[in-house]
Design a protein with these regions (language model features):
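Residues that flank catalytic or metal-binding motifs in active/ligand-binding sites
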Residues: 10-12, 84, 111
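Hydrophobic or amphipathic alpha-helical targeting/insertion segments
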Residues: 104-131
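Hydrophobic faces of well-ordered beta-strands that scaffold small-molecule active sites
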Residues: 12-14, 69-71, 115-117
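Aromatic-lined carbohydrate-binding/catalytic grooves of carbohydrate-active enzymes
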Residues: 19-25, 29-35, 60-103, 113, ...
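Short, acidic/polar
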Residues: 48-60
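N-terminal basic, low-complexity leaders that serve as flexible interaction/assembly modules and, when applicable
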Residues: 2, 9-15
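Alpha-amylase-like alpha-glycosidases and glucanotransferases acting on alpha-linked glucans and related
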Residues: 4, 8, 22-23, 32-37, ...
Length: 171
């Protein structure tokens, strides 16, 4: 049985959707045209918030009494919410990449703040290279057992009753 760490008992969490929280001057805005910060959110658009922007606002969050940040997914993805991961080894460049994440962690820890990630490991984006390897190589792919396939849908299995959707992975 897993026990809850002691620090969680008194933690005050603040959930952050990085793309919509704060845009810094570090943002690599040459990668994409961002929506206006003041325009209504578009489910397929990007506002350009990044992890440097989160780090720049840690004092404000600390003043609110926040002791732990819960970040929505930050790994590389083609969607603004980043639940459709295609690279499990790298923080999305639009969020500032791995360097921005390291910077945020260092700054948060200096302020005695914890950082928790929403890790999405039970499904992947259509852009996940191992998924493409299976589509291209079928049963000859070394990754064929990583996914559930519906023989009537070569693009993958239904997700939450909707199609198309992220592809479920075997864990």
């Amino acid at each position: 049985m897993t026990t809850t760490p002691d620090w969680v008992q008194d933690a005050i969490f603040y959930q952050i959707f990085p793309d919509r929280f704060a845009r810094s001057a570090h943002n690599p805005n040459d990668l994409l045209t961002f929506e206006s910060w003041d325009s209504p959110p578009n489910p397929h658009g990007f506002k350009g918030g990044d992890l440097y922007g989160v780090a720049e606002r840690l004092d404000y969050l600390k003043d609110l009494g926040i002791t732990a940040l819960y970040l929505n997914p930050i790994l590389a993805s083609a969607s603004n919410h980043r639940y459709h991961t295609f690279d499990y080894y790298n923080v999305d460049p639009l969020l500032g990449g791995n360097a921005a994440f390291r910077f945020l962690l260092d700054q948060a820890h200096k302020k005695n703040m914890r950082v928790i990630l929403d890790g999405v490991f039970n499904h992947a984006s259509r852009g996940f290279w191992q998924f493409h390897h299976v589509l291209e190589n079928g049963t000859g792919s070394a990754y064929k057992d990583w996914f559930f396939f519906d023989p009537e849908r070569l693009n993958g299995k239904k997700h939450w009753g909707a199609y198309p959707g992220p592809h479920e992975q075997k864990l």
